[in-house]
């Protein structure tokens, strides 16, 4: 948080990156805002650099070929975007699943970037990391964006209890929810977090009409776990809700977890079989990617 000259407290949030135009984060062309920080540690995470905040350990500074990173007298790492060539050497070097390129931004600063794309987008999607860690920030941001005539979607891992605090749902069009596993043991192993809040959110979002899409990853060699999750989700969601079944791909997964999950990607025909099962059970908008 920051104080303005008039002593008004301003909300800030750690932003990993902002993609001006995306056609894979909800309906239409959208600006996607990725916040830093996530309470999960999913084995299959493709962007683990968004999990933790930078500790300023300094490991990345010497590795930067563009000299875009430095440390001040207190040891804090600073990123110079004007020098950065986006090679991501710093991210590959970081031993803490973090990034030195995170910006602490106010709602006004985020809006300024959204407005540049406003004539060409249908709305914004907030993601991460886990964007709901910044709940108060989202409420203000969404209120301002909707005043521009744009829509707002949340991409969430389901860790935030929407039923306990539904305020953000009142200012957004819907949620794209990850349901990664329903079997307790597999869930604990896969995401290092209990599944209870996720499944509670599935019911809550359906009940209030705010569930836009559910996403599940299909893993090779995990027939029972895949089927259990697909059956559970398909039996719950409504016809109007999209169900995205994502084929596991090892590219981008941390090496230490590739050995646990396997080095083969999920076969297309294998995945399509689960999509067909989901459609038979009522999830008419099930599809694979």
What are these regions (language model features)?
Residues 108-257:
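Conserved AdoMet/S-adenosylmethionine-binding subsite of the radical SAM
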Residues 82-83, 103-111:
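FAD-binding FR-type
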Residues 2-27, 220-289:
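Auxiliary Fe-S-binding modules of radical SAM enzymes
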């Amino acid at each position: 948080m920051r104080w303005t000259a008039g002593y008004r407290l301003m909300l800030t949030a750690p932003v990993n990156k902002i993609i001006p135009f995306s056609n894979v984060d909800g309906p239409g062309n959208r600006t996607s805002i990725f916040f830093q920080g996530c309470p999960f540690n999913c084995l299959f995470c493709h962007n683990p650099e968004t999990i933790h905040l930078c500790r300023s350990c300094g490991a990345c500074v010497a590795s930067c070929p563009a000299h875009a990173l430095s440390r001040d007298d207190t040891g804090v790492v600073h990123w110079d975007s004007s020098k950065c060539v986006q090679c991501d050497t710093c991210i590959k070097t970081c031993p803490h699943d973090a990034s030195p390129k995170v910006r602490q931004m106010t709602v006004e600063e985020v809006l300024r970037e959204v407005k540049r794309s406003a004539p060409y987008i249908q709305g914004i999607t907030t993601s991460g990391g886990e964007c709901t860690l910044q709940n108060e920030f989202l409420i203000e941001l969404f209120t301002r964006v909707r005043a521009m005539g744009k829509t707002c979607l949340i991409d969430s891992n389901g860790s935030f209890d929407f039923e306990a605090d539904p305020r953000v749902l009142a200012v957004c069009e819907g949620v794209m929810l990850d349901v990664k596993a329903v079997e307790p043991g597999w869930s604990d192993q896969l995401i290092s977090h209990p599944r209870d809040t996720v499944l509670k959110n599935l019911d809550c979002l359906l009940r209030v009409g705010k569930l836009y899409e559910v996403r599940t990853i299909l893993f090779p060699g995990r027939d029972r776990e895949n089927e259990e999750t697909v059956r559970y989700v398909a039996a719950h969601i409504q016809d109007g809700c999209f169900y995205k079944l994502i084929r596991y791909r090892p590219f981008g997964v941390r090496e230490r977890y590739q050995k646990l999950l396997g080095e083969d990607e999920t076969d297309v025909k294998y995945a399509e079989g689960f999509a067909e099962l989901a459609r038979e059970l009522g999830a008419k908008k099930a599809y694979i990617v």
